[in-house]
């Protein structure tokens, strides 16, 4: 279970990094907050 969860988290980080690089016009602070909230929401849904 730990291995599967870590793989999911890793893929999500890659997805987030891709979105961030694709949208450079977004402010750093705003993107960081949205990324953190998105990761928290996704983590709660998967668990």
UniProtKB/Swiss-Prot annotation:
Keyword Transcription tagged: no
Domain of life of the source: Bacteria
Keywords for this protein: Stress response
Induction: Expressed during stationary phase, induced at 45 degrees Celsius (at protein level), at a post-transcriptional level.
One of the GO BP terms on file: cellular response to heat
Entry annotated with the keyword Zinc: no
InterPro entries: DUF2527
Record family assignment: Belongs to the YobF/DUF2527 family.
Name of the protein this chain belongs to: Protein YobF
């Amino acid at each position: 279970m730990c291995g599967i969860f870590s793989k999911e988290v890793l893929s999500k980080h890659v997805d987030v990094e891709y979105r961030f690089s694709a949208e450079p016009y977004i402010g750093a602070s705003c993107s960081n907050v949205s990324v953190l909230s998105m990761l928290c929401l996704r983590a709660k849904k998967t668990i």
